[in-house]
Amino acid sequence: MIEADRLVSAEVLQDDEAIDRAIRPKLLSEYVGQPQVCEQMEIFIQAARQRGDALDHLLIFGPPGLGKTTLANIVANEMGVNLRTTSGPVLEKAGDLAAMLTNLEPHDVLFIDEIHRLSPVVEEILYPAMEDYQLDIMIGEGPAARSIKIDLPPFTLIGATTRAGSLTSPLRDRFGIVQRLEFYNVDDLQSIVSRSARFMGVEITDDGARQVAMRSRGTPRITNRLLRRVRDFAQVKGNGAIDGNIATRALDMLSVDAAGFDYLDRKLLIAIIDKFMGGPVGVDNLAAAIGEERETIEDVLEPFLIQQGFIQRTSRGRIATEHAYRHFGMVRNQE
């Protein structure tokens, strides 16, 4: 089982990007959720524009699917500058990054997704570029090699990562602004559902929007993906409009329950409760019991279940919490 097979995956799936780009907010005033981040960014952007400066370099981190790329686009729009986009794995050689930097216009935004995956040699190029707006390039090889400096226009680097702890200290310290994106509450997700439905030309009631929001695992990317599938259901099984009943039937058919769990989440929890008496159970035994890889459990399934309080990870193994028992209408055996 891979993350790309799951409807409730927070990672980008094949049909997400083009549709998400069409409904993506363009300005801070259109951005739903993350109120503290929006308030701070509005001040920082306004101050930079008043001074005629480039915005300070910005690091955005948090779980996947929460809007890091969207926020980078908004920053460029609010600053009235161009956005150049790339990602850590794409920048294999120092020359790849140098080519992008030398093509920037004053105050442009360079957005590097998955910045924690930059190679050390590329990262070294970034240090003087971020700090002094200079590019240090080695010309030639061996004893004849020499370093030349190229001046760069003032620019803003926006780095996005799901693993802020994987960034080296020298790189992390060069970001003047650091923003963490949190999981969204149901009210904000409901607003996102309603907004996306308008862009898609779909009629949806408040109850229908809330049903989709409740099962979206706090993640707008999942919200929009579920909405597209519910729209299909409403089109074929109803009159095209989405109300609470249609949304519930559609999501039940898709095996996404009221907590946002899919069959794999439920399979894991039921295995701990039924096969291992609620735990503790080691991850290797658990992987064998449900027929999945250890990495799938640790990297794909566990983070959300732990964050929601359904699994506790201890030194002796995984334990199903009372929350998990209540979700399935079960009572823990006290013996």
Curated annotation (Swiss-Prot):
Entry remark concerning the domains of this protein: Has 3 domains, the large (RuvB-L) and small ATPase (RuvB-S) domains and the C-terminal head (RuvB-H) domain. The head domain binds DNA, while the ATPase domains jointly bind ATP, ADP or are empty depending on the state of the subunit in the translocation cycle. During a single DNA translocation step the structure of each domain remains the same, but their relative positions change.
Localization, UniProt: Cytoplasm
Main location: cytoplasm
Reaction equations catalysed: ATP + H2O = ADP + phosphate + H(+)
Keyword Ion transport: no
Function per UniProt: The RuvA-RuvB-RuvC complex processes Holliday junction (HJ) DNA during genetic recombination and DNA repair, while the RuvA-RuvB complex plays an important role in the rescue of blocked DNA replication forks via replication fork reversal (RFR). RuvA specifically binds to HJ cruciform DNA, conferring on it an open structure. The RuvB hexamer acts as an ATP-dependent pump, pulling dsDNA into and through the RuvAB complex. RuvB forms 2 homohexamers on either side of HJ DNA bound by 1 or 2 RuvA tetramers; 4 subunits per hexamer contact DNA at a time.
Keywords attached to this entry: ATP-binding, Cytoplasm, DNA damage, DNA recombination, DNA repair, DNA-binding, Hydrolase, Nucleotide-binding
Broad EC category: hydrolase
Positions with a binding annotation for DNA: 294, 313, 318
Domain of life per record: Bacteria
Entry binding sites for Mg(2+): 69
Phylogenetic placement of the source organism: Bacteria, Pseudomonadati, Pseudomonadota, Gammaproteobacteria, Enterobacterales
Stretch list, region Small ATPAse domain (RuvB-S): 185-255
A single BP term in Gene Ontology: DNA repair
Source organism per UniProt: Photorhabdus laumondii subsp. laumondii (strain DSM 15139 / CIP 105565 / TT01) (Photorhabdus luminescens subsp. laumondii)
GO cellular component, one term: Holliday junction resolvase complex
One Pfam family here: AAA_lid_4
Residue numbers binding ATP: 23-24, 65, 68-70, 131-133, 174, 184, 221
Family from the record: Belongs to the RuvB family.
Region (Head domain (RuvB-H)): 258-335
SMART domains referenced in this protein's UniProt entry, alphabetically: AAA (SM00382)
GO molecular function, one term: four-way junction helicase activity
Protein's recorded name: Holliday junction branch migration complex subunit RuvB
EC number, UniProt record: 3.6.4.-
Region entry Large ATPase domain (RuvB-L), spans: 4-184
SUPFAM superfamilies with a match to the protein in the record: P-loop containing nucleoside triphosphate hydrolases, Winged helix' DNA-binding domain
